[in-house]
Amino acid sequence: MKVSVLITLAVLGVMFLLTSAEERGSDQMDSPAWLKSMEIIFQSEERECRWLFGGCEKDSDCCEHLGCRRAKPSWCGWDFTVGKWEMLINMNIFRIVFSYSMCTV
């Protein structure tokens, strides 16, 4: 009985030492310098775009689902789309309404 308790305590001690060593190694991964370097990597991959109500000169200046509103001063506004499927649905609805309005005239 005493031997099994000693073996259990020895195993727990070894496990404690291993986990504390892993935690010390992870401190380097969580450091602000490491996070800033990763932030620079991700920013370099992204295209700079202007958010809602940001200034713009053309539609490509604005982020996805935003278009450049030409009212002075020009600003990025929502273009009433959510995704590719939303745009296709809106185009089909426009076609249906337009064809219906042409038939009733």
Curated annotation (Swiss-Prot):
Disulfide bonds join C49-C63, C56-C68, C62-C76. Residues 22-48, 83-105 form a propeptide. The modification Valine amide is found at V82. It is found in: Secreted. GO terms for cellular component: extracellular region. Residues 1-21 form the signal peptide. It comes from the Eukaryota. One of its GO terms (molecular function) is ion channel inhibitor activity. Expressed by the venom gland. SUPFAM superfamilies: omega toxin-like. Probable ion channel inhibitor. This is U21-theraphotoxin-Cg1a 4.
